[in-house]
Amino acid sequence: MRLVVIAIGRLKQGPERELADRYRGRFDDIGRKLGFRGFDVHEIPESRARDAKQRIREEAAAILALAPEGAVLVALDEKGKNIDSAAFADHLGRWRDESVTSTVFAVGGADGLSPELRRKARLSVAFGAATWPHQIVRVMLLEQIYRAATILAGHPYHRG
């Protein structure tokens, strides 16, 4: 299974980019051994539309255009479920074992994700009740993907 993160906005050079790259690299090392075929990250520029609803629609269309056909869609959304790392790993492991070809993680911009995109998501995940900057959400997501791989591999990184 291929993992794809599609995020609105760009991570500039700095500590967030360094952490994101570190977790992605760590995943690459362990992910291949677990049957994951790759890990792509796509950054989409924020919409310039003046109206928030229009921005959300344009950003959702851009996310869906990059999502491979038949992919499982996971929305990172403040209204999503709070799941623990083991449950997150269970989802990834199950989809891999079901021969899902791709899992797409959608990270919205400042205005969030469109209702249409949220409806299409098989899973909607929140990292707590707080609202997080998209740069931090991206780092947290990449860490959780790496942590999920270590859980699936029985690696001691996750001690929960």
From Swiss-Prot:
Gene3D superfamilies: 3.40.1280.10. Its main location: cytoplasm. Its EC number is 2.1.1.177. One of its GO terms (cellular component) is cytoplasm. S-adenosyl-L-methionine binds at residues 76, 108. It holds the Pfam family SPOUT_MTase. The keyword GTP-binding does not apply. It comes from the Bacteria. GO terms for molecular function: rRNA (pseudouridine-N3-)-methyltransferase activity. It catalyses: pseudouridine(1915) in 23S rRNA + S-adenosyl-L-methionine = N(3)-methylpseudouridine(1915) in 23S rRNA + S-adenosyl-L-homocysteine + H(+). It is found in: Cytoplasm. The keyword Plastid does not apply. Keywords: Cytoplasm, Methyltransferase, rRNA processing, S-adenosyl-L-methionine, Transferase. NCBIfam families: PRK00103.2-3, PRK00103.2-5. HAMAP family: 23SrRNA_methyltr_H (MF_00658). Specifically methylates the pseudouridine at position 1915 (m3Psi1915) in 23S rRNA. Homodimer. Belongs to the RNA methyltransferase RlmH family. This is Ribosomal RNA large subunit methyltransferase H. It comes from Nitrobacter hamburgensis (strain DSM 10229 / NCIMB 13809 / X14).
